[in-house]
Amino acid sequence: MVCQARFGVKNASRGHRMERPQTVKGKIMAVEFGDSQRSLSDTLTGMIASIRGNTITLRELMIEIGEQGFLLLCALLTLPFLIPVSIPGVSTVFGAAIILISLAITLNRMPWLPKRILDREIATEKLVPTLRKGAALVSKLDRYVRPRLNFLTEGALMNRFNGLMIMAGGVLLMFPLGLIPLSNTLPGIAILLLSLGIIQRDGLMVAGGYFFLVATTVYFAVLGYAAFAAGQGLSHFFVS
């Protein structure tokens, strides 16, 4: 199992969902399971279509996405980063939420998010179009997702490891490099693949998530080295 019934995906088959979580003073308390034949892309599309008003909070997104669990919420939060359009402030809020949710996955606990993050308002004018474009990409992935390479998605040890990998992606997503090409896209793809892979028991997709995490780390290391080398060159120029 991905985790015990108190937290997430009940079993490996497509279509099992979590009922809407109950909240008390900003804390997610408990969930119940039901059955749904909706695909992941259909769930995302329906949720996006339900967004109304000029702003939306993460709390409202969590209530809407509750039907298929918090791993799907992690996937949802990556959608704005799958296209080369930066929305100021979103990577910090969404990255922090992903880190806390992945911590809950690692510890096999219901996720708790601070009120400050839950109630942070996000403008829907830019968010909704990017979510729609991201959901279109997920619908293409949906055709190829299936249970395979089970050793990457089964067992308590792999659950914790995969939770840590999603957390690492959230940390990389929060790096203040939004204006640099691919700095949000690469970790976003990693988190998306990991989340969908765990939900659907697709070890190949999980392995793809590992690959993009490594690629992100290497990319950031190259950027860091380039910045350091440029700084050294400038210092030598002014000293000489």
UniProtKB/Swiss-Prot annotation:
Q: Which cysteines are joined by disulfide bonds?
A: none
Q: Which InterPro entries match?
A: ExoD
Q: Which GO terms describe its cellular component?
A: plasma membrane
Transmembrane regions listed in the UniProt entry: 60-80, 81-101, 203-223
Question: Which keywords does this chain's UniProt record carry?
Answer: Cell membrane, Membrane, Nodulation, Transmembrane, Transmembrane helix
Which N-terminal stretch is annotated as signal sequence? none
Q: What is its main location?
A: membrane
| Membrane protein topology class | Multi-pass membrane protein
Subcellular location, in the record's words? Cell membrane
Q: Identify the domain of life.
A: Bacteria
Biological role? Required for nodule invasion. Mutations in this gene lead to sensitivity to alkaline conditions which prevents nodule invasion.
Q: Which family does it belong to?
A: To Synechocystis PCC 6803 slr1875.
Per its UniProt record, what PANTHER family does this chain match?
Answer: EXOPOLYSACCHARIDE SYNTHESIS PROTEIN
Write the protein's name.
Protein ExoD
